């Protein structure tokens, strides 16, 4: 045979082979599609008469005649689905919703290209156990409103790693919400709607740190705390109506995009946190039918509010009206017990002397608090000492723990304190001889502490109810850490081995949700997915916990490890990664120097900028290492929009490094004192006032709204950082000391900056929260005058700003007052009136005696009354309901109901840098600390 004939024969054989392959592929889908056609009772308006399924109505195929889309929606179709649908291996979209199809949903496992499965509003009776198996491309699944037999969400959901929207409302689901909805298993999940099922148990802590924007869990048997919501910073709408959730509403200040908050018909207790009330994004809130306490919250005019009178335990029905001081005190007492429902049910109204369980009064004064055998847990609140007429306190036969507060010894009329048969520990305080103290039945009384891992489930006694609570769960975690850490220290050798094992395991474990860096063994890890200015931190691939993370600490000394461990949800980053991003800590990258190290600018391979604070062996003494660990401990507990957030850290041999977000607008000091040199514009009064309020809110959280009281001790303009939006954030917590439980002062070495130091602190070294008030007063003076706290360029009698300010104020000379105002501030009548109020406030803050200074809450109230609050002016075009929330609430509800087909509330179908100050060495700061950070993630804000 000639070569030409042979070539022709080969060509013909190839064509026949290709034709046979094409026919076999088409035949595969054709058989399945014919089975589908036979199983369904198609209506007359559906034309599936053509022999080629690719030409059927609502069916699409690819270039190889493989079926990719079947979209038969709202056609009134009856029948069942065939069992061989899974052979449509190229299927991308299957939509059969709003029909009358019945029978079981067939096995669809292995459909690796399927992106959308929409079968809602049919008559399906069961779900295959391996429904999600092999569906690695699945992005959307809607099965709501089907009469399924009871079923449990299968573990195979974890295989749908691309899942974004999952709607399974009214689907007969039972059991608990699984943990795998966390960001590690389903990193792209943004909408989770599981309402009207039979779910029970608590919200999984794995929700923390997820990208979930819409969470609907209405009408079930769910219970426990909702504290995890405070760490779901991407939330836009959350609806938990009609469950059995209890405890307080957590701090929600980190949920900057939250629009809809519906917790109607639960058993929530405690004070509505100011962080919810002040959310500028909020449009709809529903709190009716709970046991919420304290004052009725006053939301902005743009917020649609559903708070039916007498359907909670508020002290009055008038929004914004303050409670009787006795009520505030007792609510604070209830907070330390974890806000038990039994107290919230009884403690209603604004007069605790009328039918409040356990409360007895005489002449309007509370004389007896009797909580015997009330099944209380938690601790004794020091706030009890505010009830100065108390004669009897009976807390016997409960499950209380902790110490007996020293403050109770100040009760001059107290005759009996009975804490028998609880779990108190420590040495009881010394009461007067006239007081009978009954402590029997407390096995650990007189000892350092109980042999337990938890102190109290309730909020710590040092916190106050006015700013809201983060719930009992968070306090329990905090307590656990205090006990666990010493244990970890005792077995450090074993933990080193475990840490090494974790590192090796982390290197082997694959994370399909991570995006591999092309340049190194790194991944891009989103720090705050709900933020407009996402900060991405490049770290080595690892097995990171979502949200809560591990609270224990271990460290591998291996230089080869890229990441050591996760502590309290923060990233432990290798020294090599930090060397790479800072150009090996080059001089060109230095942003500033401080007493304990140098701060470098770093840039990740994707362009993200960070600030790295490095303390080398030459400057890290034992004391410095203690400072470093203290700084980590404090920073990891700070969650507030106006406080710094720690991104990560590194411990490697003698290296100690902290990683902060980069703040493009630098420090307040730069804008206030060096704006000309840096080519900036001077701050106008409105901006200065907003910055002052931001700082006050951040420090207020430190003082009274955190689980324990913190004192900053070195407030100054170089420790106040500004973001691109010019919102302020307080930095430099290296000098913070944790105040003792229930107290607000400590005695320690003087650490701060001259000019900002309160006189009693500078002289005696005794520090209280009032030293921060003094420092803030100095900052207010600087904002008004544009002068530094200490200015050597001024005449000798005017070098010290506070002294000069007092002299001007005492003169009561109107011209002297106006001449003292920064000439760069444009003045009109309103501005002058505003400055006068801040001038007066600054003077009170810098009073010589600490007791004459206001607390930070008062400062916030004064400043907030002078600040124009932002109001929403545009409707989000991407609103999931397509509803204009600027319409009147009745119209919104009507449109919402029409969309949902429900008669109730909506358901669910269908700076220069962080961590650095001046480049100059600042000897007056003892020591200088970082001064730049960006927006914090999962805040625990009270304001």
Swiss-Prot record:
Disruption phenotype: No visible phenotype. Tmk1 and tmk3 double mutants, tmk2 and tmk3 double mutants, tmk3 and tmk4 double mutants, tmk1, tmk2 and tmk3 triple mutants and tmk2, tmk3 and tmk4 triple mutants have no visible phenotypes. Tmk1, tmk3 and tmk4 triple mutants have a severe reduction in organ size, a substantial delay in growth and development, and a decrease in fertility. Tmk1, tmk2, tmk3 and tmk4 quadruple mutants are embryo lethal. Its EC number is 2.7.11.1. GO terms for cellular component: plant-type cell wall; plasma membrane; plasmodesma. Disulfide bonds join 54-61, 315-323, 353-361. It is a single-pass membrane protein. This is Receptor-like kinase TMK3. Coiled coil: none annotated. Residues 1-24 form the signal peptide. The keyword Transmembrane helix applies. Belongs to the protein kinase superfamily. Ser/Thr protein kinase family. Residues 504-943 are cytoplasmic. It is found in: Membrane. One of its GO terms (biological process) is pollen development. ATP binds at residues 591-599, 613. GO terms for molecular function: ATP binding; protein serine kinase activity; protein serine/threonine kinase activity.
């Amino acid at each position: 045979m000639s070569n030409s004939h042979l070539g022709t024969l080969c060509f013909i054989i190839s064509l026949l082979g290709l034709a046979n392959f094409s026919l076999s592929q088409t035949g595969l889908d054709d058989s399945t599609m014919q089975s589908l056609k036979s199983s369904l009772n198609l209506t007359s308006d559906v034309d599936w008469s053509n022999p080629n399924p690719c030409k059927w109505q609502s069916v699409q195929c690819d270039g190889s005649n493989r079926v990719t889309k079947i979209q038969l929606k709202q056609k009134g179709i009856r029948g069942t689905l065939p069992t061989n649908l899974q052979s449509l291996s190229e299927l991308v979209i299957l939509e059969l919703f709003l029909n009358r199809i019945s029978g079981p949903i067939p096995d669809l496992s292995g459909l690796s290209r399927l992106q959308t499965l929409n079968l809602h509003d049919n008559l399906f009776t069961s779900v295959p156990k391996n429904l999600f198996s092999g569906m690695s491309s699945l992005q959307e699944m809607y099965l709501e409103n089907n009469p399924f037999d009871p079923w449990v969400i299968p573990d195979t959901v974890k295989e749908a790693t691309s899942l974004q929207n999952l709607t399974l409302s009214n689907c007969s689901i039972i059991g608990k919400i699984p943990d795998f909805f966390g960001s590690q298993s389903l990193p792209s999940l943004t909408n989770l709607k599981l309402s009207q099922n039979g779910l029970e148990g608590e919200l999984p802590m794995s929700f923390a740190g997820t990208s979930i924007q819409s969470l609907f869990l209405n009408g079930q048997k769910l219970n426990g705390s909702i504290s995890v919501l405070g760490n779901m910073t991407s939330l836009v709408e959350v609806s938990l109506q009609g469950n059995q959730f209890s405890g307080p509403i957590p701090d929600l200040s980190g949920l900057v995009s939250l629009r809809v908050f519906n917790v109607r018909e639960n058993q929530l207790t405690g004070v509505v946190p100011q962080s919810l009330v002040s959310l500028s994004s909020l449009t709809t809130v529903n709190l009716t039918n709970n046991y919420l306490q304290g004052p009725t919250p006053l939301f902005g005019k743009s917020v649609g509010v559903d708070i039916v009178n007498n359907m909670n335990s508020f002290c009055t029905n008038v929004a914004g009206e303050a409670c009787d001081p006795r009520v505030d005190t007792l609510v604070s007492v209830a907070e330390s017990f974890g806000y038990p429902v039994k107290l919230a049910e009884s403690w209603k109204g604004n007069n605790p002397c009328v039918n409040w369980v356990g409360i007895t009064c005489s002449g309007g004064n509370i004389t007896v608090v009797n909580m015997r055998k009330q099944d209380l847990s938690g601790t004794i609140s020091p706030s009890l000492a505010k009830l100065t007429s108390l004669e009897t306190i009976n807390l016997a036969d409960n499950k209380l723990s902790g110490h007996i507060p020293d403050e109770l010894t100040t009760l001059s009329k107290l005759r009996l304190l009975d804490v028998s048969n609880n779990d108190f520990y420590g040495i009881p305080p010394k009461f007067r001889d006239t007081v009978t103290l009954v402590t029997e039945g407390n096995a650990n009384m007189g000892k350092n502490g109980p042999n337990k891992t938890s102190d109290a489930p309730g909020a710590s006694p040092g916190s106050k109810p006015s700013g809201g609570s983060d719930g009992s769960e968070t306090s329990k975690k905090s307590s656990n850490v205090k006990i666990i850490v010493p244990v970890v220290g005792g077995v450090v050798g074993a933990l080193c081995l475990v840490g090494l094992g974790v590192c090796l395991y982390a290197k082997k474990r694959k994370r399909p949700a991570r995006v591999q860096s092309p340049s190194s063994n790194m991944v891009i890890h989103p720090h705050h997915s709900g933020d407009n200015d996402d900060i991405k931190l490049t770290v080595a691939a690892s097995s990171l916990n979502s949200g809560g993370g591990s609270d224990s600490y271990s460290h591998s000394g291996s230089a080869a490890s890229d990441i050591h461990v996760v502590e309290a949800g923060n990233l432990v980053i290798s020294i090599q990664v930090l060397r790479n991003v800072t150009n090996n800590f080059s001089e060109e990258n230095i942003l500033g120097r401080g007493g304990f190290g140098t701060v470098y600018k770093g840039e990740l391979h994707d362009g993200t900028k960070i600030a790295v604070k490095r303390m080398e062996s030459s400057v890290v003494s034992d004391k410095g290492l203690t400072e470093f660990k203290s700084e980590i401990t404090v920073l990891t507990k700070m969650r507030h929009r106006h406080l710094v957030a720690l991104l990560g850290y590194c411990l490697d041999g003698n290296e100690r490094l902290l990683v902060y977000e980069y703040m493009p607008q630098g420090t307040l000091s730069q804008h206030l004192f060096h704006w000309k040199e840096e080519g900036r514009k001077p701050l106008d009064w409105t901006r200065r006032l907003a910055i002052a309020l931001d700082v006050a809110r951040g420090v207020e959280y430190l003082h009274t709204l955190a689980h324990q009281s913190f004192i900053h001790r070195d407030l100054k303009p170089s420790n106040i950082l500004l973001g691109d939006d010019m919102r302020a954030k307080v930095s430099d917590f290296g000098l913070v000391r944790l105040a003792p439980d229930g107290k607000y002062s400590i005695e320690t070495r003087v650490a701060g900056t001259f000019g900002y130091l309160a006189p009693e602190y500078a002289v005696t070294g005794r520090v209280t929260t009032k030293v921060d008030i003094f420092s803030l007063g100095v900052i207010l003076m600087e904002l008004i005058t544009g002068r530094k706290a200490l200015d050597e360029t001024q005449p000798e009698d005017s070098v010290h700003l506070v002294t000069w300010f007092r002299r001007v104020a005492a003169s009561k000379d109107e011209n002297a007052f106006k001449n003292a105002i920064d000439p760069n501030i444009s003045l009109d009548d309103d501005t002058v009136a505003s400055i006068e109020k801040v001038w007066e406030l600054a003077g009170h803050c810098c009073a010589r005696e600490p007791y004459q200074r206001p607390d930070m809450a008062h400062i916030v109230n004064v400043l907030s009354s002078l600040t124009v609050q932002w109001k929403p002016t545009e409707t989000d075009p991407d609103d999931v309901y397509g509803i204009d929330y600027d319409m009147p609430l009745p119209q919104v509800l009507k449109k919402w109901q029409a969309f949902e087909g429900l008669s109730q509330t909506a358901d669910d179908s269908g700076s220069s840098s962080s961590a650095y100050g001046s480049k100059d060495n600042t000897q007056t700061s003892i020591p200088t600390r970082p001064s730049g950070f960006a927006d914090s993630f999962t805040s625990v804000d009270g304001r």
